[in-house]
């Protein structure tokens, strides 16, 4: 039986054969870094879920306008609901990484998946919030907000919560980008100083 450490004919170890050594200080820094990412994802989830709920419950009766009558408000609801689901999934992968000390998928796929989806969903929230803010401003100039102040106020709150979710997801995207850069430079998602 061949020894797992004996390489023949100039073979080199693959990334799977390569284990990363981390000192206690480095392990603590990695734990703090992963905790910060988990906290950002939790904040993104909270704000996007709150925005979706505020938009979903924004109806005052049959005489009042409904959120689903406006394309931009439907966009805000759907975008924030998608980001809330994505954030729950990403929080699960963070917890998996804490408990198992490995990624859910192969490392190369995981870092690119996180970064790419953080980018796409950040832009989705930004575009939904921008479209809804423009509509809310237009409505404020017309008769809609003078007759239905509560509807406009709740729409503004939902839009603001969506922008807050965007900010936290954008910060999370920066950390995911840092992981991609570390992966490209060192072959691992771990920090450059490990």
UniProtKB/Swiss-Prot annotation:
Belongs to the Casparian strip membrane proteins (CASP) family. It comes from the Eukaryota. It is a multi-pass membrane protein. Pfam families: CASP_dom. It is found in: Cell membrane. Homodimer and heterodimers. InterPro entries: CASP/CASPL (IPR006459), CASP_dom (IPR006702). Residues 1-35, 96-114, 179-194 are cytoplasmic. Residues 57-74, 136-157 are extracellular. One of its GO terms (cellular component) is plasma membrane. Keywords: Cell membrane, Membrane, Transmembrane, Transmembrane helix. This is CASP-like protein 4C1. The chain crosses the membrane at residues 36-56, 75-95, 115-135, 158-178. It comes from Arabidopsis thaliana.
